[in-house]
Amino acid sequence: MVKQVDPFYQQIARTIAQEGRQILCIAAEAKLSAFYYTIGNSLRGAPELLLIGNFEEKPTMKILNKLSEMMLETGRAFSNGQRVNPFGGEHDMQVWNTTPIAKLQYTAQVGEFLASLDSVTGVPKDYTVQQVVLPDPKGRYPADKRCHKRYRVPVLRPTADLMADMRSTLVH
């Protein structure tokens, strides 16, 4: 990997070289939930993963690591809205394509890290983000009004996807 100037990005580069990715945990503040995201999947042609919620750090990081490995093993991103169950639990997780808000408000360090590489190596600055959404203990997702409040997190899906879901619900 390229030598970084900024110590923060030097550490990220070392972790990516050793582990395949870095996972950042951003603590909750005021009314904003904590969130976790990967840095490094995009260097291998896969989306970065984002998970929003005030969840325990180690299990959340384990989820992002496992899902990243699943993507890299198959050589492709998850399909939009794909349900995955990497640990064989009772309920599936969902993976959604995200809007540019994910990059601007949640994964800014990815862009900054890639930009620092781009200036030296020509690594592309652009990247995609997919959001991992956890169900509540009863299997309900944030769109369900009965979803437990701890699991009611913003889902950063493009408006066109949401409208398509609403139309399909009305048709059935």
Feature roles, as predicted:
Residues 1-29, 43-46, 54-172:
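Acidic, proline/glycine-rich low-complexity IDRs
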